[in-house]
């Protein structure tokens, strides 16, 4: 964001940091972060900010480098199908020197096929590994997925009001608005025993 730009967004970094602190409070020792496929979204900036928030919060919470697994975009995995992609991700997690006790994904859309593949490979969620998404879309509700909630409809309404005001030559009292997010606790996370 350039000073003076008008807009509305969430704080992706702070939101992901909230997720990391939550997982730390549950006693998770090894975290994995799985990026969103680059080719499926115009929101590359949000993905980058969420990854940065994950990395910085992990360090701030005292996680050592060997306790953090960051998986690159799924589009970097050589695969012919979506199942191949998620099989590849789970295989990499299984072969990691330390298997994660919790996995963060950059969007809920990644969590759904990942959850299916984790279960297919014998991992129990949340008993063996916790899983946290981001966005709180319909997928999250259907999967009982713990996730970071944002309100895209409200973001859109505020953006539309700002746009109309600018088109009418008005000066905005608040050019840039940062919208709140909240962690929605559901059935894919639990305290490490």
Place the predicted regions along the sequence by residue.
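Bacterial carbohydrate/catabolite-sensing allosteric modules
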Residues: 2-193
């Amino acid at each position: 964001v350039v000073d003076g730009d008008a807009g509305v967004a969430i704080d992706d970094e702070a939101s992901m940091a909230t997720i990391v602190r939550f997982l730390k409070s549950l006693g998770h020792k090894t975290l994995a972060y799985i990026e969103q496929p680059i080719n499926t979204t115009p929101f590359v900036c949000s993905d980058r900010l969420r990854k940065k928030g994950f990395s910085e919060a992990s360090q701030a919470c005292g996680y050592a480098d060997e306790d953090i697994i960051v998986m690159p975009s799924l589009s970097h995995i050589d695969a012919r199908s979506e199942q191949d992609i998620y099989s590849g991700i789970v295989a990499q997690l299984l072969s990691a020197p330390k298997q994660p006790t919790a996995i963060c994904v950059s969007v809920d859309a990644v969590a759904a096929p990942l959850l299916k593949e984790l279960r297919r490979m014998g991992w129990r969620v949340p008993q063996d590994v916790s899983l946290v998404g981001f966005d709180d879309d319909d997928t999250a509700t259907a999967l009982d997925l713990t996730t970071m909630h944002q309100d895209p409809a409200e973001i859109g309404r505020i953006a539309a009001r700002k746009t109309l005001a600018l088109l009418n030559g008005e000066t905005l009292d608040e050019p840039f608005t940062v919208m709140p997010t909240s962690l929605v606790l559901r059935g894919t996370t639990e305290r490490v025993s």
